[in-house]
């Protein structure tokens, strides 16, 4: 597919999702995304990071899913060069980017719950490599335009990713932060997976700090895997 020339996807995920790529909805996603890339508009994350969440966490390695909404649409300056904050993982940012308010709150709650030191780096790649799928429901965005790529149809694809994981892998720990993410509960088979919900970590939302969400995640992880998840960065 032409899409994978711009946005590499690992063999493990290509095999896991192979029947999706020929379906009309996905061909339409490919068409719309490639048209967006060709336009004068700036698209985040860079195309090489479009499937970064999948490439860092193979389907067989997924233990936790932390679902996000869509990529950060902002930029930061590095040596006078404007760079995207988004890097293809939900809530995560490029290594040298300023830490956004939502991620700051995630780090605060993680420290309060489990004593994990507050990181000065917002790159969550280490979590992904340990089995946490950091998937956004919408995989791309136009610079400075939040939710601008909802029209592309990514949610149909991310829903299929989730449903296939829910069918083939058990049990998973599914962390849904905020009302938008919690709409995905309908996709999750009952009594098969562990669902953990909390308010969105955005400062505009109330109730995330003090929710104990990471205490719940760690408790569930211990029950399933008989060890702690390593949240260090």
From Swiss-Prot:
Keywords: Cytoplasm, DNA damage, DNA repair, Hydrolase
Enzyme class: hydrolase
Family annotation (CDD domains): UDG-F1-like
Spans traversing the lipid bilayer: none
GO CC annotations, alphabetized: cytoplasm
Entry's localization field: Cytoplasm
Primary location group: cytoplasm
One of the GO biological process terms: base-excision repair, AP site formation via deaminated base removal
Catalytic activity: Hydrolyzes single-stranded DNA or mismatched double-stranded DNA and polynucleotides, releasing free uracil
Chain's role: Excises uracil residues from the DNA which can arise as a result of misincorporation of dUMP residues by DNA polymerase or due to deamination of cytosine.
Family: Belongs to the uracil-DNA glycosylase (UDG) superfamily. UNG family.
Annotated protein name in UniProt: Uracil-DNA glycosylase
